[in-house]
Amino acid sequence: MIEDEKAGLQPMDISDASVFFFQADVESKDFLTSLFDCEGKSDDRMLRYADAIIDVQNLNFDVSPQCLQSNIAEIITKFVLLSQDGSRRGLSRSFNFIDPDIIAGCREEDAIEFLLINFVRCHHELGKSGTSNCYKKTLESTRKAVFSVFVMIQRGYLESQLRSQHASLVFTKRLLEDTVSNVFLRTLVEYLASTDECDEDAITETFNPIFGILRSGIICQRFEDNKDEIVRQILRVMNLLLSIRLPSNGPRPLSNLLVNREDFLPTPSEKIQGREFGLMSFLGPFFSYGLESSARRPNHRVFVDCEEDARKYDGSVNTEQKLYFQRMDPIRTMLHQLMLPLASDQGSRNKTLRWIATIISTNDIRTRSHYDPSDVLCDHYMTNFLSVMYMFSEKIDLSKIIVDYPFLPSSLINISKETRLKMDESGAVAFASQFADRPDEYHFSTVCFFLTIAAQRLVIPPLMNQISEYSRHLKELKHKINALKEKLNTVSGFERAEVEKKLNYETEHWKLMSRHLLCVKTQAQDPALMASSMDFVDKQMKFILNLLCDNLDLLGDDSQLPTEVSQMFCALPEYFLEDALDFYIFAISNGMKLLMERNADWISRLTVLFTQYHYIKSPFLVSKLVRVLSSIQPPLWFNVVRLRMAQENLLMCMIKFYSDFEDNGDFYEKFNVRGNIQYMLEKMEEDMFYKGKFMDMARECGAEFIRFVNMVINDATWCIDESLSGLKSIHDVEKKMANKVEWDNTDQEIRNQDLGVYEEAKRKVKGWLGTAKSNLKLLLSITVNSPEPFRTPVLGERLAAMLNHNLSQLIGSKASELKVKDPRSYGWEPREFVSLLISIYLKLNMPAFVKYIAYDERTYSPEFFHNAIECMRKNSIVGFSQLESFEHLAEDVKKEYEAKAELEEEYDDVPEEFKDPIMDAIMVDPVKLPSGHVMDRAVIERHLLSTPNNPFNRAPLSHNELSPDSELKAKIQEWICQKRNSKK
């Protein structure tokens, strides 16, 4: 007391302190007694309440907080151990994975209920102002005691009286019902994470069983059962638990706990498959909720009576699909919310990224053309997975992406075996070696960006391939069903029963596969997924273009673009670009409305890339780029033709690539590429700038343009020949079938062979006739606007020969062999073909081309043209004015033909040294080859257009290596003059 006076403190009367502590004890005892209020309790439960109240009255509060907590915990433990099975809670929600018969009204429910209620009371009292320190100590000790008992129950320390498994089920159910306060959870986690309060295993043994119950719960849900509300509650609770942080923005203990579970990252063996890992891992079942279907086990419970919708190709969706979109959108958002704390917390981030990377690496066979679906995760799982990755990538700033990450030895994406944009395998290895010593740690944005690109590869292209494959399969099934229906009308008895059985089987198969296709389309056409894809792919393309040119200004000119691309760009995997192109191809057909609502910079980027297609090694990748551009329709097409950076090069690149693909690509893909370029040229005809540029190129007759026109002639020739040969085969078989008696008596094996030829011929005609027509129309367009290239012998002679040959086929002596029963089903309109040929003839009615027609020794003769004119007149194949113009052309050609005959007679003794060694005709412009051989320029240039080598030794040869033989040319001209003078 004296010391207090020296310190200047007012001395306290001992009696006042006694009163203070007495009042605090009373307040504490009253509060603790209220926890065990027995009012309204049944007689059989009264005893334990009374015992607890007596224990409270005997408590000594003048002890340390730890001792007080222990004493209160002992009272609570004693009380809850006497819990009894009671009545079930009213209005309790039902969850199909928690058996109500096990936990409803059980002792554990009573105990948990008691603890939760009393925590709330403690928290409420602590929130009051003016609380004395002594009373506050009691409240805090009581709260910790509640946690202590709760944890003991959950850990199984009281297993003989209170079963931990039942307690976990009860608590999980309360979490799902949202009847556990967030404060309780947060404070409980803080208590468990405190080394002063609990051992390191406490949090694991308390919450791991709860995580296990939630995981089991999600496994029990089936999309077709429409239990979305349960799924949403499970995901909500998972997010709630994982998001709990320690004070002062500390770590998330439960996120760390989850990623350290053994089943979070099951150790993948060398043989582990994607499906096995995806479903074994803890998070797997959460991503597995959705519209499940496979070709082996089609989902027969969905899209019933909607099978015809599978045949639609316009991107439209039916009501049932829209319903599935609405159901999955909130669930995918909640999946992202579940993953967000795992990816955000420093302690759990690395393992979470490793889980994502392992899902990708173990399912990488989804990128193959053919794979066993049982080895990989299903489409709905991967679509959910990709949706989450897209959400992670929404806020990524490209300026913060470390571009060298994919090349690091420790990178989570493995690109070592990937084909590069413009680098061979050894170059890629050498390029990656420079990053061997880079640090392993990279920020989340970088890793997430590249993982999303890798994940996208496993989803978008496979879905597109499946839609294409199953659509084709359904089309074949429909043809088969129609054929069986026709056959059903012609058979009877046992054979009819067999046909009916087969028809029923094929019809049922068609229905199942239609439903499966609708399931696949539903995954791919989800508008939320497509919108996210558009945003990410736009970011992806911007990233690729940035490697070409930093801060590329799409409104500027092409001077920004480098002559040589960076090594980083060259080393990028092809799929970085290819997957973006695949998505745009799909989006143009199925999400045009979404594309129209977005910035059109993506079109500008693709156009720029095509005008510099030499940056890309693979012609197939460039062909896919062409396919995207050709698919763009007005008004978006305006962004292609009006891009300042591309205006100078776009047309030339189209023409050049048209020819370049000849030797680099697949035979059939060649026609696809050229068809796409032809379609782009058609659209450009409406643009005066490009129309004028095309005419200028034609007038210049540069090497690339000559090469381009030659390819058009080649393709037209081949496609027409294939189509006409197919029509002849159809005609021959139909002729046999028309004689029913003879056909019925024909050996079955021979009939089957003929029918095989018949079907193959029909496919061939349908496949090539449209391409033939397109090439003829392109030739006509060139002749209308720019006939100059056909003045040159190298092209004029080839086109004249092609026109003559095909005209003779169509209206010559064997034209009747092209008549078939149903020509329109193949797109076969012979009058239209003849009209196209005549139009090309007439547009090239100039002296040089007239000469080329007359000099065609293979087909032309005056009688041939005369007969053709009579046939067209008799059958009114072309209009009167066209026919009249063609008659005038025929007269001019006849005169040139007669003049040629005179020259041949005049030059019948041409010296051998003046003759072209291949054509055996007098040379007009002799040139020397590097091998020393001499040829006529027109002949060797025509040869080089299709085969760039020396015809005598097969050595590579180009136009630039041809040197004029002026001396020989002078001798030939002198000889010709002498012959003419001698004739006079």
From Swiss-Prot:
One of its GO terms (biological process) is protein polyubiquitination. Expressed in the germline (at protein level). PROSITE patterns: U_BOX (PS51698). It catalyses: S-ubiquitinyl-[E2 ubiquitin-conjugating enzyme]-L-cysteine + [acceptor protein]-L-lysine = [E2 ubiquitin-conjugating enzyme]-L-cysteine + N(6)-ubiquitinyl-[acceptor protein]-L-lysine. One of its GO terms (molecular function) is ubiquitin-ubiquitin ligase activity. It is found in: Cytoplasm; Nucleus membrane; Nucleus, Nucleolus. Keywords: Cytoplasm, Membrane, Nucleus, Transferase, Ubl conjugation pathway. Forms a complex composed of deubiquitinating enzyme atx-3, E4 ubiquitin-protein ligase ufd-2 and cdc-48.1; within the complex interacts with atx-3 and cdc-48.1 (via DDDLYN motif). Forms a complex composed of cdc-48.1, myosin chaperone unc-45, ubiquitin-protein ligases ufd-2 and chn-1; the complex targets myosin chaperone unc-45 for proteasomal degradation; within the complex interacts with cdc-48.1 (via DDDLYN motif), chn-1 and unc-45. Belongs to the ubiquitin conjugation factor E4 family. The U-box domain is required for the ubiquitin protein ligase activity. This is Ubiquitin conjugation factor E4 ufd-2. It comes from Caenorhabditis elegans. The gene is ufd-2.
